Amino acid sequence: DTLIANPRHNSLSYYADGSHSRWCWCDALFMAPTSFARIGKITGEPKYFEFMDKEFQITYDSLYSVADSLFFRDTRYINMREQNGKKVFWGRGNGWVTGALTFIIDNMPAQHPSRVFYISLFRQMLKKISTLQDKQGFWHSSLLDTASYPMPETSASGFFTYSLFWGLNHGYLEKEEYLPIAKKAWNALASVVHEDGKIGYVQPIGADPKKVDICLLYTSDAADDS
């Protein structure tokens, strides 16, 4: 309620004063909007959805590449390029967003005028992301430069696998097109689960693509640290 009553107007440029008090990095779209959406559903008060929607769309305007149907991690990466000359789109960062969209759509009232925006965004992103799956069924740290990041990355792959199955189960994705992709991703993830329940090939904590040169073992909630 304090945030809603005292909205911030700082620039979302990453190094601008006060930018971190707003959702200036794509991970934040999982951290904050999902909570507002859930509170809005529990209380039934429109103000939580109104604030969430306004702030989300400001971040969307700042970080979403319409041409690529993917989010930059933050404004620092908009003009950066990978070794192959492609834009820098972080796998896990985009996973945070697709995961967030499932919660927002699930909790937002069916009649809310912006709900169609989130459904459309979800479909756009999953359509693009599905084309970036590798032959094994994984996604990589950098979505557009798998040559520089040849090892699979399972925190991004986990987010995308969840998002695919959620979209299928809720009728937002066509089974004929997306079910084979989702099953392939699930089987890929299952293949790197160790006997002790830990999963391999998780990128370390960070804010951008990093190489997974060894089989890093994390518990399933390691991604909570971003």
For the regions a language model picked out, list residue spans one by one:
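A beta-strand-loop signature enriched in Asp, Gly, Thr, and Trp
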Residues: 122-182
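A glycine-biased, small/acidic residue-tolerant capping/turn segment at secondary-structure junctions
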Residues: 196-212
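Conserved small/polar residues in nucleotide/adenosyl-binding loops
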Residues: 218-226
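Acidic/His metal-coordination segments adjacent to aromatic residues that form catalytic metal sites
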Residues: 13-18, 74-87, 140-148, 216
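Aromatic-anchored, glycine/proline-accented short structural segments
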Residues: 79-80, 84-135, 139-143
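Long, well-ordered core segments of solenoidal/helical folds
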Residues: 1-13, 46-73, 119-137, 181-198
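Aromatic- and histidine-enriched alpha-helix N-cap/loop-to-helix transition segments
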Residues: 23-34, 88-103, 151-162, 181, ...
